[in-house]
Amino acid sequence: MNLTELKKMPVPNLVALAQSMDIEGVGRSRKQDLIFAILKAQAKKGEDIYGDGVLEILSDGFGFLRSADASYLAGPDDIYVSPSQIRRFALRTGDTISGKIRPPKDGERYFALLKVNDINFDRPENAKSKILFENFTPLFAQKRLTLEIGNGSTEDITARTIDLVAPIGKGQRGLIVSPPKAGKTMMLQNIAQSIGHNHPDCYLIVLLIDERPEEVTEMARSVRGEVISSTFDEPATRHVQVAEMVIEKAKRLVEHKRDVVILLDSITRLARAYNTVVPSSGKVLTGGVDANALQRPKRFFGAARNVEEGGSLTILATALVDTGSRMDDVIYEEFKGTGNMEIHMDRRIAEKRIFPAININRSGTRREELLMGQAELQKMWILRKILHPMDELAAMEFLHDKLKATKTNDEFFSSMKG
């Protein structure tokens, strides 16, 4: 029996399962207590129980396997991992571990890990010889992440516009710069759907920091991938802990030569959370940002890279501007030159209800010639030459109308020739 499967079951099903196993007094129990009772009954029968999670090592040397469904929040159903197991398998925070577990004995509060079956979806003996993420050689993105699905839907127009204006590669470090209400969250959702559809081999994580709860639900229902969130009613320490767990997990997967994509909404809110958490250094920049506060969010964003030894970590993060807060502008200025791809969104275009509201002239990818063939590059440069003299609103409107008339970008380029 698997602990993770039990967590996903609705409460009425758990109650029915408990009653079928003749467990008494389950009528008005909490979901947690139900799972405990079921697993204890299973263990008494001598059956094996399995569980999995992402390891968080605490300062005392032991660790816990946190659940992605609970956005890595500490809970009573976490699985205890002993210091001897951590040393034996050279485990680090962020390792995804699955294995055999046992229920708590008298006086214990947590399930404990008995035997490790998998580390980062790989055999445990393979995990010991991995190169550390910090020792990898970073390169420019070279393999393209094509977003176009080619079904002619309105959502696909966003993906096709990004493919034309600022193509994304595996290992890209991209910034989506947007004023409020310009459609940045919808754009991230479209990107997530495209990656889930076109690149199922990529491990997709959507990280929502300081967002509205209903947007988290909508994202979780529409995206094929892991949606991790810390809503605006959570404390800043929680935002920071979630972000640290996600980036550590991503690094461990890249060490196993996986391609990981993180979509972060938004890096501004994450930087604000770090600003609240970091101890005061006495040096304060404009807008109330502590001089040391941006070090850790920069480390998060800077982890995105294409790795020569195999694997890649792509991070696309949204940055807020024109919010009326001086702090947000300072945070954006600090991150401005750090990415190798930028998409600028324009409120004026969004107010005219043209989506995606992209300012084409200001958006682009560095070294885009590595991502595409010479013929496609020439076509894109010709398109930019046509759009450049226009006002940004007229340029986006022109491109939007042309894309709406065709199903794919190849078709669009053919129609341009004619």
Swiss-Prot record:
HAMAP family the UniProt entry points to: Rho
Cellular component GO terms held in the UniProt record: cytosol
Organism: Allochromatium vinosum (strain ATCC 17899 / DSM 180 / NBRC 103801 / NCIMB 10441 / D) (Chromatium vinosum)
Pfam families from the UniProt entry: ATP-synt_ab, Rho_N, Rho_RNA_bind
PROSITE patterns named among the record's database cross-references: RHO_RNA_BD
Encoding gene (name): rho
Keywords, in A-Z order: ATP-binding, Helicase, Hydrolase, Nucleotide-binding, RNA-binding, Transcription, Transcription regulation, Transcription termination
Source domain of life: Bacteria
CDD domains: Rho_CSD (cd04459), rho_factor_C (cd01128)
Gene3D superfamilies documented for this protein: 1.10.720.10, Nucleic acid-binding proteins, P-loop containing nucleotide triphosphate hydrolases
Protein name as catalogued: Transcription termination factor Rho
Residues engaged in binding ATP: 169-174, 181-186, 212
EC top class, as a word: hydrolase
